[in-house]
């Protein structure tokens, strides 16, 4: 959670996550989603403008998503339609297409919709998606096939009475029961052998694992009933990279580097589906316009409607964290000019509005400049052929963050330049002088270019290699390395020095040129033009908020139950007396701590024994304090006491078992455990498997 909280200061004071209750806002907004912000003082026309802008951006996202996913899937869609349209052979085998991309995600919802539309155009009227992992027998499979689990088509329960062509997509085939898969394929194959049903069924396997792993798990009965053809889809990560490139170029709303990094981590680190990433992007757009009253400023500036920027907006703009930081920096200078500037910015609305427009335009220009520079450096990386390559989106994130000078990719480019030959070095200098170097660096680059050209003309050959290349396989000591290098021709040593000058000139350009090392969120009114608020996205999609609350409340219940100071004093007194407060802890807390220490499967009996031992520990401490001598009873009295102790022991054991079972039910209700069919005396963890 610390990684999330440290970013909240970026948008502090900009987003209102708890608007005024709708019942006090009038009838006009009693049914709408958007409500007046800024303490309920926002005019109604601005609320409607925020809603219209949000709808516009969401429609833009839908168009971009549809266009990008269709272009990415066009090849496979065309191949599947051609395969489904092929004439039926006389073997009577079930025609099957296996679609895979060797990743955790294969087909996605957009692909299903596009495939259904294309299949309908060529005569396949029904479209059914069947998740085999959720079924255990053929009857339940055919029941789902009848109704259409995806809701895109209806299939008659009596399959022999089919009169329309049907596309059947099988999901989770790698995780289902192999016997069920073989039986289903055998049943479908026997149906299509019927004279009336030949060519009426086309089966598609959605495979999420490499094809080689799937082949090894199949039996001869499966292979004898199908005629398969493999289609390799574009990986989900490639589709999402294309989607992000289109969003960056076309979407009206700009995303900051924090939200961009969160989006991309979803499909690289968590391997989420395409729909889940798009859903998160939609949620971020809605959050920006729903909770930010200043989200209309960019639209007003773009439309030149400066008169619509109200005094209420100007007052709110003065509370933006980036502007407050800008004012504090000017006050630290302390000269008369800075003091007058701050006074006019805080008191003169006309001057402040002019500066807001100018600063927002400068910020948008800065973003366009960084985007252009990211493309240039990305092309340079491909030209110098570095050992590792990253996507354009990674480049842009690094540039927006202002960390390009210290990034591993920049160092990799510099290392590649130090290993260039003379021909590539001349071409690299021409590219740098034309696209990257500015100001004094341009003149220095021309001087280096002239020096290198003269060195090549004076050398015995027109081809030079640096010392780094000639010594790359040398494994001697530093002293012997210097001795070997001293034996090289002078032109080679001078060429290596020229390459180092190029790298030094690049360092100067990155640090002091148009790029700089300052993050874009340091510019005033960054929060107004960019959405970079990660907390709602983490809480809604990363599942960190709910899990962290459950974890912290079970591990440290003293922060959630009773008076914290009183509990702290009780703990300190217990530590002084050599006792513990295990008996005070809730049963759920004790069970959860044992849960956290175990593996993926938990034996219920072992868990119960450990739970009872934890509860008995507190009672044993109390018994140790009772050291008063007592006379032992004799005769019938002893037998009666033994019977009472036995009844008491059974009663305590029954209470202990009930407490344990109640705690298990609480863990199940929270979604932390689930029963397993293989071992009835075990339960399985749903999270924290490691």
Curated annotation (Swiss-Prot):
Q: Where in the cell is it found?
A: Nucleus
Q: Which InterPro entries match?
A: ORC3, ORC3_N, ORC_WH_C
Report keywords, A-Z.
DNA replication, DNA-binding, Nucleus
A family per Pfam? ORC3_N
Task: Note the CDD domains from the entry.
Answer: Orc3
**What's the superkingdom here?**
Eukaryota
Gene Ontology molecular-function annotations: DNA replication origin binding
Major localization class:
nucleus
A Gene Ontology CC term for this entry?
chromatin
What is an annotated GO biological process for this record, any one? Answer: DNA replication initiation
Functional description taken from the UniProt entry: Component of the origin recognition complex (ORC) that binds origins of replication. It has a role in both chromosomal replication and mating type transcriptional silencing. ORC binds to multiple sites within the ars1 origin of DNA replication in an ATP-independent manner.
Which PANTHER family does this one have? Answer: ORIGIN RECOGNITION COMPLEX SUBUNIT 3 (PTHR12748:SF0)
Q: How does it assemble?
A: ORC is composed of six subunits. ORC interacts with cdc18, recruiting it to the ars1 origin of replication.
- Belongs to which family? Belongs to the ORC3 family.
Q: What is this protein called?
A: Origin recognition complex subunit 3
């Amino acid at each position: 959670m610390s990684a999330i909280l440290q970013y909240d200061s970026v948008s502090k004071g900009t987003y209102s996550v708890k608007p005024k209750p709708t019942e006090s806002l009038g009838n006009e907004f009693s049914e709408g989603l958007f409500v007046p912000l800024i303490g309920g003082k926002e005019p109604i026309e601005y609320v409607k403008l925020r809603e219209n802008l949000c709808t516009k951006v969401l429609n833009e996202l839908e168009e971009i998503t549809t266009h990008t996913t269709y272009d990415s899937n066009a090849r496979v869609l065309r191949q599947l339609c051609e395969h489904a349209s092929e004439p039926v052979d006389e073997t009577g085998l079930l025609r099957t297409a296996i679609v895979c991309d060797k990743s955790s995600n294969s087909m996605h919802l957009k692909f299903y919709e596009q495939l259904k539309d294309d299949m309908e155009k060529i005569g396949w009227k029904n479209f059914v998606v069947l998740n085999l992992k959720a079924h255990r027998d053929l009857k339940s499979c055919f029941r789902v096939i009848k109704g259409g689990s995806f809701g895109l088509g209806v299939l008659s329960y009596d399959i022999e009475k089919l009169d329309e062509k049907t596309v059947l997509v099988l999901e989770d085939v790698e995780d289902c029961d192999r016997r069920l898969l073989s039986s289903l394929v055998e049943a479908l194959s026997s149906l299509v052998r019927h004279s009336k049903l030949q060519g009426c069924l086309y089966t598609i396997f959605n495979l999420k694992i490499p094809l080689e792993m799937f082949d090894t798990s199949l039996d001869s009965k499966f292979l004898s009933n199908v005629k398969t053809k493999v289609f390799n889809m574009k990986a989900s990560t490639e589709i999402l990279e294309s989607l992000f490139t289109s969003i960056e170029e076309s979407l009206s709303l700009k995303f900051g580097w924090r939200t961009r990094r969160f989006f991309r981590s979803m499909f690289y680190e968590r391997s989420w589906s395409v729909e889940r990433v798009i859903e998160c992007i939609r949620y971020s757009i809605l959050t920006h316009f729903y909770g930010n009253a200043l989200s209309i400023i960019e639209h007003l500036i773009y439309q030149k409607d400066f008169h619509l920027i109200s005094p209420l907006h100007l007052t709110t703009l003065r509370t933006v964290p980036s502007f407050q930081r800008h004012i504090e920096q000017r006050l630290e200078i302390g000269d008369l000019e800075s003091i007058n500037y701050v006074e006019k910015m805080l008191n003169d609305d006309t001057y402040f509005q002019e500066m807001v427009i100018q600063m927002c335009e400068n910020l948008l220009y800065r973003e366009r400049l960084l985007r252009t520079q990211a493309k240039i450096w990305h092309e340079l990386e491909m030209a110098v052929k570095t050992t590792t390559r990253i996507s354009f989106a990674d480049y842009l994130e690094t540039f927006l963050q202002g960390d390009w000078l210290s990034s591993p990719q920049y160092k990799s480019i510099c290392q590649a330049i130090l290993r260039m030959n003379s021909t590539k070095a001349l071409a690299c200098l021409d590219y740098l002088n034309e696209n990257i170097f500015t100001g004094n660096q341009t003149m220095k680059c021309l001087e280096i270019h002239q020096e290198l050209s003269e060195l090549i003309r004076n050398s015995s050959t027109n081809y030079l290699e640096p010392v780094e290349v000639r010594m790359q396989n040398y494994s001697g000591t530093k002293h012997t390395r210097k001795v070997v290098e001293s034996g090289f021709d002078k032109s080679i040593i001078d060429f290596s020095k020229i390459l180092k000058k190029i790298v030094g000139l690049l360092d100067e350009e990155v640090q002091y040129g148009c790029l700089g090392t300052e993050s874009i969120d340091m510019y005033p009114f960054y929060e107004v033009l960019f959405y970079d608020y990660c907390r709602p996205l983490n809480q809604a999609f990363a599942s960190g908020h709910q899990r962290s609350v459950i974890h912290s409340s079970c591990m440290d219940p003293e922060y959630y139950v009773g008076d914290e100071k009183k509990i702290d004093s009780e703990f300190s007194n217990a530590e002084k007396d050599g006792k513990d407060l295990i008996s005070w802890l809730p049963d759920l807390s004790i069970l959860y701590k044992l849960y956290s220490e175990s593996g993926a499967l938990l034996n219920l009996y072992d868990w119960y024994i450990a739970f009872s031992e934890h509860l008995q520990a507190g009672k044993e401490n109390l018994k140790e304090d009772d050291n008063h001598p007592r006379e032992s009873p004799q005769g019938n009295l002893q037998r009666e006491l033994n019977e009472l102790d036995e009844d008491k022991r059974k009663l305590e054991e029954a209470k202990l078992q009930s407490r344990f079972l109640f705690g298990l039910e609480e863990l199940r209700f929270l979604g932390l455990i689930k029963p397993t069919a293989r071992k009835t005396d075990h339960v399985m963890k749903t999270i924290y498997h490691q």
